[in-house]
């Protein structure tokens, strides 16, 4: 090859290198521009949300008045029948809307008084209100409470005695009795043509006045608790024309609300939404100890020191966890009882009644212990394990402090719980996405807990409004601050561990679980990074899609493995991977970051990751 040709090729190569360098610079500029635009977009969304809230206030003012034809009677029924002095927020407005034949959706936090929004109109309208509720046990409890108030309410299910079923069916079709509320499950409506025919007759004689759908978020496939039998409810608006529909839930995002309206055929339903904030609740996220014995010891110490003699709930992931923890609490002198769906109904009821009466102090439960729990003086709710969604966490923690007095909500969090939970919910349509949102909440040690909840429920919120009623805001005044570090070098170590494990096993058995990955990474970075840092790094890479879970199904279980994620496959090795860390000495962290960028390494073992004491994680 001639020198002229070689020189020409070298020149072309240099030119291409220059073009590639320019493109890299343009990509970096575009990324920065994208970040700026995202910030502007989020700011506009917050303004729009605040404007929407203003519009909601206008709607509330229109309906929350005492000038309706039935207002005086409604107040009399409230005092004389329900023995209440005044309406809670949104109750009066919702009642006025459905009495005006308007479709409506009420979003009220757990314990906010949703039931009255259809129970009182049932007496006002002097006809039948059909209540669709998912749990038979909850239905039976409500009917018992209504009957104590002298209100005729009934249900139709597999356990209903024949004589009672006959009475109810005659009342539905003839409309000449005092039956005011009929409770059914969505399954009952979906599977019983006879039931639907009877309701049509009820409408024909002018007896059916209102349809109330409890836990209405279950209609939405994008909700945290979608139930297929709720899909049948899309026939109600067509089949029972002129009958208003009232949906009730404790939590619903805008997407879920839109989906519910579309599915039920009530696109212009009036939405009454209470603010998400419960000012009397103190939210805390604590690092879950590595061993179960240590975790039990910590919970026992917390209950004895801070909540001695006070009522509480502890939520666990599985029935086995419930039984073991309840046994451990009792062994430590705490009056506790387990509660889960696999218990006999009579045993569940007995545990519930003992807790309500104060005979036992703490109920240790799965999510089976939830809807319809009406005990105002719960002083603490502890989550022994990570909930499957923010909605679940908000509802479960919201069972504390219904009397308005101070209460504490404690969540114990550790990475290993992510994989336990994901293996249980991975087949739900939005299960993993909902779980990862919960992980973002739990793993964030910088952002006010109420800000995180507000973001999820699409409400405007300023950290200063929290009044130090969460662990983040409580420590912020004394906090040494945070530092954003580039963890791209450490990410390479993580990816190499995964790939080396796979390549070393010819039979494909080299897949690695999250817990095993943490052990190997901690050994690789021993003396340079703490185990807590390694845990936070894996979670960060998982949430940012540099890693992802891959599920393997066996006869007895579902196993979660961690594999290389989509984002890593398109990752430019020159780019940073920023991660925010609690930091005792921010300047030193930034200096270590600069050193890390400058380091030229040829193997994982040579990565300079700084000193252990630079970072306080989790």
UniProtKB/Swiss-Prot annotation:
Coiled-coil annotated residue ranges, if any: none
Pfam families, sorted: DEAD, Helicase_C, RecQ_Zn_bind
BP term (GO), one: DNA replication
Keyword Nucleotide-binding found: yes
Motif (DEVH box): 214-217
Catalyzed reactions per annotation: Couples ATP hydrolysis with the unwinding of duplex DNA by translocating in the 3'-5' direction; ATP + H2O = ADP + phosphate + H(+)
Major location (coarse): nucleus
A single MF term (Gene Ontology): DNA binding
CDD domains according to UniProt: DEXHc_RecQ1 (cd18015), SF2_C_RecQ (cd18794)
Cofactors (names): Zn(2+)
Family note: Belongs to the helicase family. RecQ subfamily.
Name of the molecule in the record: Putative ATP-dependent DNA helicase Q1
Organism ancestry: Eukaryota, Metazoa, Ecdysozoa, Nematoda, Chromadorea
